[in-house]
A protein has these predicted regions:
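Short, well-ordered coil/turn segments that N-cap beta-strands
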Residues: 12-16, 63-66, 96-98, 134-137, ...
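Acidic (Asp/Glu)-rich catalytic clusters
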Residues: 58-65, 92-95, 154-159, 227-230, ...
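A C-terminal functional module that forms or caps the active site or interfaces directly
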Residues: 217-264, 268-272
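N-terminal glycine-rich anion-binding loop in soluble enzyme alpha/beta folds
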Residues: 1-60
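C-terminal functional extensions of proteins
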Residues: 260-290
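Conserved, mostly hydrophobic/aromatic
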Residues: 18, 68, 103, 139, ...
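N-terminal active-site wall of soluble small-molecule enzyme domains
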Residues: 64-66, 70-127, 132, 222
């Protein structure tokens, strides 16, 4: 799947992933009104609104971008109907030729980790039949539990030709409370980066490993170091825009071939119509603004 992601990036010339992280406050009133008229002010109504919102954005952007990244928490907050909207979004994006990164940040051990992996990027056996429950192309994984937590995901990736982005240095301000702790003179995030590179050695696509890393745009100097630590790992870069990451800092995350990273933008794209410079589009044309 890493080969497909790179092919999509080369085709579009845009190393961008759109974060499909819908909140009701981002969704134009006319979409909410229509959904609530059909389903009431219910979880089902909210889920219908976010599904229709996502669908319109994807329809307007799918030929401009290589990938999308739905954050599952934004769907889980609406319960089972929200998860149905998540699945519909994943399927629709894949049908449009987009690579889907499920931002699930799972982390556990043994059979629990295997179940997470099977549920999101693998297949589950039900009697004589098999099903791919959510069927994303990549997922994000929390490595805090070590190899016991990550290896079950890697095993499924090998079987299904899928991929991972493992949290290494996250974009949030308090990430340093743990990630910057020094161990034998080196920060923990660097040691995690080395482990990601090691995990990726046996998981190569044509040019890059399908075991990637998450490194925040808010820490460009650390990104520069980690780029060297993980030369064959694709880096998913959150934190650009609303979280403070600057465009000039993004160069550190790429290799000299112009590849090696994909930059996430969520509200900057899906809620573009709320920005002053795109306000002329109005709520009705929100997807055109995106």
């Amino acid at each position: 799947m890493i080969n497909q992601l790179i092919a999509n990036i080369k085709k579009t010339g845009a190393p961008i992933v759109v974060g499909l992280d819908p909140m009701l406050k981002y969704i134009p009133e006319h979409i909410q009104k229509k959904a609530f008229a059909e389903f009431g002010e219910t979880l089902e109504g909210a889920a219908e609104a976010i599904w229709q919102f996502n669908k319109e954005i994807v329809d307007k952007t799918y030929d401009l971008i290589p990938a999308v990244k739905p954050q599952i928490a934004m769907y889980e907050q609406f319960g089972i109907p929200g998860l149905v909207a998540f699945k519909k979004t994943v399927d629709y994006c894949k049908a449009k030729g987009l690579v889907v990164i499920g931002d699930i940040k799972r982390g556990d051990i043994g059979s629990t980790s295997s179940a997470y992996a099977v549920g999101h990027i693998g297949k589950v056996q039900v009697g004589s039949k098999t099903y791919a429950p959510f069927d994303e192309d990549f997922v994000t994984v929390n490595p805090y539990l070590g190899s016991d937590g990550v290896n079950p995901f890697i095993d499924v990736c090998k079987e299904e030709k899928k991929g991972l982005f493992i949290l290494v240095k996250t974009s949030n301000p308090s990430s340093g409370e743990f990630q910057d702790q020094m161990i034998d003179g080196r920060p923990l995030y660097e040691l995690v980066g080395e482990k990601v590179a090691q995990w990726g050695e046996d998981c190569m696509g044509d040019e890059y490993s399908y075991i990637g890393a998450v490194v925040g745009a808010t820490y460009p100097e650390m990104g520069k170091v980690l780029r060297k630590v993980m030369p064959k790992s694709y880096i998913l870069v959150p934190g650009y825009g609303a979280q403070g990451g600057k465009g000039k800092d993004l160069v550190h995350f790429f290799n000299e071939d112009g590849l090696g990273a994909i930059v996430n933008s969520s509200r900057g794209i899906i809620a573009a119509y709320k920005q002053e410079k795109y306000a002329n589009y109005g709520e009705e044309a929100f997807a055109d603004a995106s």
